[in-house]
């Protein structure tokens, strides 16, 4: 196991069968370079399993800044503000639309196997309030099969190198 910046993976080209990126992309300095590196290290036929925050989710889960002070927690509706204002309140983390993600993969030798938006498992709520948490999870995950899935917590993409 190695620790490295996502933009400069210390692996040989075409050396990996799978790159698993779970809620990482939004934290890197150069997301386009990080995606390019993921593709570079994949063998042909290798896959990226990518999860990253959806701009359509009604809460900013990474907290926000207000008057120079950081406030931890889920903040409602920040992601729905105009992008310039949203980025001032949450400059430490990126969020993505489907088009934003597609742009990151543009021109790379890949094909898309799965592209959808998902809601979370809400295990932390289930742990504290089991009945409510399970009801909430069931309801929100049922929304994944409706047009309201665009409000999901995260993008889940499976991308294959060709």
Where does each model-flagged region fall?
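Generic C-terminal helix-cap and adjacent flexible tail
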Residues: 161-162
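S-adenosyl-L-methionine-dependent methyltransferase catalytic module, highlighting the catalytic core
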Residues: 3, 29-37, 47-158
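A short beta-strand submotif of the Rossmann-like class I SAM-dependent methyltransferase core
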Residues: 21-24
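A short acidic, Gly/Pro-enriched loop at the edge of an enzyme's catalytic core
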Residues: 7-18
């Amino acid at each position: 196991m190695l620790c490295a910046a996502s933009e400069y993976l210390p692996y040989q080209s075409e050396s990996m069968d799978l790159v698993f990126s779970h809620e990482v992309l939004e934290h890197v300095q150069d997301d386009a370079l990080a995606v390019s590196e993921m593709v570079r290290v994949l063998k042909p036929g290798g896959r990226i399993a990518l999860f990253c925050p959806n701009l359509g989710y009604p809460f900013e889960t990474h907290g926000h800044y207000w008057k120079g002070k950081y406030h931890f927690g889920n903040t409602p509706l920040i992601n729905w503000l105009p992008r310039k204002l949203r980025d001032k309140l949450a400059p430490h983390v990126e969020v993505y639309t489907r088009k934003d993600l597609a742009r990151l993969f543009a021109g790379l030798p890949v094909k898309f196997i799965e592209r959808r938006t998902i809601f979370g498992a809400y295990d932390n709520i289930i742990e504290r309030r089991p009945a409510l948490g399970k009801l909430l999870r069931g309801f929100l995950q049922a929304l994944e099969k409706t047009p309201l899935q665009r409000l999901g917590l995260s993008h889940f993409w499976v991308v294959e190198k060709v």
